[in-house]
Amino acid sequence: MNKTGIAHIYASQNNTIILVTDPTGAETIAKSSGGMVVKNDRDEASPYAAMRAADMVSEKLREREITDLIIRVRAPGGSKSKIPGPGAQSAIRALSRAGFKILRIEEVTPIPHDGTKKKGGRRGRRV
């Protein structure tokens, strides 16, 4: 019997957060972030911190006997960056190397349908 979990990976330019829930999304199984594994604030979003956070999560998943993962990658989105941060790819790679079967990878970044105005004013950011 294969047990499935959903890995929500939120990767911004400042941090990488990994949260694993059950398939309904109601129960949190494990969570970790780049800030929990490194000391410097500037290293929270690094691929190394994301890899260590994914290793912490994978240990908790083995205790719960979860074998399959659905991965949902999210960037800040909205009026902010729509590109995931540097830790997203290394977190996915670390989870696959830990021996979990990845069923699918989804991109769930929120896209505005002409929502709020971008910051910077009428004439944009002047460099």
Curated annotation (Swiss-Prot):
Q: Keyword check for Translocase, yes or no.
A: no
Keyword terms, alphabetized = Ribonucleoprotein, Ribosomal protein, RNA-binding, rRNA-binding
Kindly provide the name given to this protein in its UniProt entry: Small ribosomal subunit protein uS11
> From the Swiss-Prot or TrEMBL record, what is one GO molecular function term?
rRNA binding
User: What domain of life does the native source organism fall in?
Assistant: Archaea
Which GO BP terms apply? translation
Q: Which NCBIfam families does the UniProt record give?
A: arch_S11P, PRK09607.1
Q: How does it assemble?
A: Part of the 30S ribosomal subunit.
